[in-house]
Amino acid sequence: MKIWLLVILLVGLPAVLFAQPDYIEVNAPGNRQLKLAVEPVLSPDGSSPPDASRNSSEVITNDINMSGVVMAEGRSLQPPAGNTSLSDVNYAPWLTAGFDMLVRSELSLQGDRLVVEFRLFDVVNRKMITAKRYLGVAKELRRFSHSFADEILRALTGEKGVFTTRIAYVSAQTGNKEIYVMDWDGYNPLPLTKNGSINLNPDFSPDGREIIFTSYKRRNPDLYRRPLSSPVEVLLSNSKGLNITGSWSPDGSKIALALSKDGDAEIYTIDKDGSRPTRLTIDPALDLYPSWSPDGKQIAFVSDRMGKPQLFVMKASGGDVRRLTTTGNYNVNPRWSPKGDKIAYSRMVNGAFQIFTISTDGTSDSQLTTEGSNENPAWSSDGRFICFSSVRSSGNGVYVMRADGSGQKNVSQTKGKYFQPVWSAH
């Protein structure tokens, strides 16, 4: 067995396996970047509400700034630019202050239930753009704020945001490699596995309700499936040897993975219940890391059939294999963009991994990271962002960046080692 494959068996770090729209136009050429003010949440009487609401404007501001679409700022005008009615806005002071849009929100209680109303206003044209009302408990306010940030992005671009989505990842913070899930911005981390073994390669189902992952809990790297809402784990594949790098098909009916039951690792598909294993690659080299195209017709994967690990693409049924990467000697971790036009991956550059994207015809290759060592890129469902694991002097963790490499941000809330983040679709 080749040395670089042995690493996953002993260490469990797969990244080193291989030696005219109905919305506001914000991107018109020549336009300056628009500015959005986000007021603090108020109670109906105009006073500041309980502590639970204090982070709401910060959540919305951070979400919108991460999008890069407009510049958001948590801001209140003194004296107030309007009265306590959400709809009664004095636009002139906001316009004078240089803002184009305004978010106002109000929090109240109905018995033991929290009622939050958000409104987005067009300051320049003096009108309301959109509004949303939420009913729940106090701990849901952060989620409500993310949800309204999604609606703001929909109003600005025509596409809903991904700020209510989650990221699954592997962490060794307990001494064992367990799988966790957190909000996209790193808040509310929760363990999904607690078996004290090595757990790797999480991947969300297309509906975001389940994950698949590989676990060594039975002393063999087997593939499991479990819902996020239940601790029940279903064994999908326990062939002798590797059952790793599972990837859910876009329609949720199949899973592509690497199996070594016939010798070297090869790409197979199985049905979502683990049945009907079908071999796709037939090559004496190692083939791993399958990633489906968004239309489900192709699969990208990694192979060292040319001597060094490179990215290849084939039909989802196998065959018509073509080499994608021609630059670099160590290219791994392919992830197909939801938009279908690019594949993100990791390349070894001067002894460290960096994140790249390449067009699906191989003609355009762009480096997105330069600091530290960066691995395991995964796209958000709208193709606007990429999450990845990073080891750098400014802090290790799960990072998020825009698809062009800008806005790199460590979203991990605790110190430790983080691996293999993957973004949910919902």
Role assignments for model-derived ranges:
Residues 21-22, 84-151:
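Amphipathic beta-strand/beta-sheet edge segments enriched in Tyr/Trp
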Residues 113-115, 175-180, 220-224, 264-268, ...:
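Structural motif
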Residues 183-200, 226-244, 270-288, 314-330, ...:
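Multi-bladed beta-propeller domains
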